[in-house]
Amino acid sequence: MRGAILLTQFILPPLWRSLLPKAELWEAEFDGECVKKAVANGLLKGINPLVGDQKDPATLEEWVEKSGGNFDVIIDDGGHKNSQIKAAFDRLWIEVNYGGFYFIEDLQVGRSWEPKPELETMSQIIQDWIDQLLVGDWNVAESRQRHPLPQDVAFITCQLEACVIAKTHAKFAIQARPGGGKRQMHQAPLPLVENEQVIQLLV
């Protein structure tokens, strides 16, 4: 299993290691000095650290290049500004394998921390995506124009303060067609992901 975890503090590696002992884990942190101290204190055993701002396109490209991308799970518990969350999702969603999951935590902060956010709140964007999933092509032109549903979203499930966006299985991959909003099956099924494949968490 390949996974990525976007964290603001290195306080949970032992938890992830105990929950996913065989996973390949990557954790991203904004504070480089924090990473150095964590490594020196032996807190990141079995964890591959990444450093930088998740809002910065160059940083995101560096993370993908260093980690190799192709994650089964991504958990964004990093920067809570809407611009940070959206920038990371826009670049990293394509790195989620078919059948994988992209978790976004603390979505409520996008409203409380940014009374006048740089862009619409991530919770509003996700609501538009859900609207398009629920009713297909019927009467969703407005929400699709504001925030088109990303390609290959199978479902979105939300709870208090967090949502998970699931990527469809390769065999049933659905693509959002630009412009018209029509959705279609892939002409040729992509290879299935084997259950025993290593899962990587990218945060």
List the model feature ranges, each with a label.
Residues M1-V203:
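S-adenosylmethionine/decaboxylated-SAM
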